[in-house]
From Swiss-Prot:
Gene Ontology MF terms: alkylbase DNA N-glycosylase activity; DNA binding
GO biological process: base-excision repair
EC id: 3.2.2.-
Native source species: Nitrosospira multiformis (strain ATCC 25196 / NCIMB 11849 / C 71)
Any matching Pfam family: Pur_DNA_glyco
Protein name: Putative 3-methyladenine DNA glycosylase
Protein family according to the UniProt entry: Belongs to the DNA glycosylase MPG family.
Keywords for the protein's UniProt record, in alphabetical order: DNA damage, DNA repair, Hydrolase
InterPro entries, alphabetized: Formyl_transferase-like_C_sf, MPG, MPG_sf
Superkingdom of source: Bacteria
Amino acid sequence: MSMSQPSIDFSASSVDVARSLIGATLLVNGVGGRIVETEAYDHDDPASHSFSGPTRRNQVMFGPPCHAYIYRSYGIHWCLNFVCRPAGHGAGVLIRAIEPLVGLDIMRKRRGLSDERLLCSGPGRVCEALGITQEYSGMSIDTPPFQLTPPLDPVPVVTGPRIGISKAKDVPWRFGLAGSPFLSRPFRQPDIV
């Protein structure tokens, strides 16, 4: 009897994908760790880049699921999103934080600091630590340089409002690994899902 590897269905809703990514392991060129924080965005969500329809900047969000959508936030930091829902829909999941596990020396060098809790605790920090830039946008995340392994066992997940946005701030589409010290920001009165 063979054991099948758990998988994440990227054609599902962004909320379901965001929740199922918590506890998954993400490596980029062999560097990375466990995903501990995500946020979901959908085409009918005023906080989503896809809300006003396809543009040159967000066209990857409207492509096939299971691809990387990279954009620059505030003209400074790269941010990594995973496209979900069927092509043409315009949905994604922002990777907000990971627990660094593999390639810590490389991450420390890229980030210029040693505190493991700060290496990947925020979307810009994730991209800097993992060496992710615009050139990765549109790449499939189920082939190198990406390696995504779903969690083998269920993990405790908390949810709450998304952060760092000006619209739809109360929508509880931020997900985190309960008790993780590697979150970008603690959850205020989190709900356990």
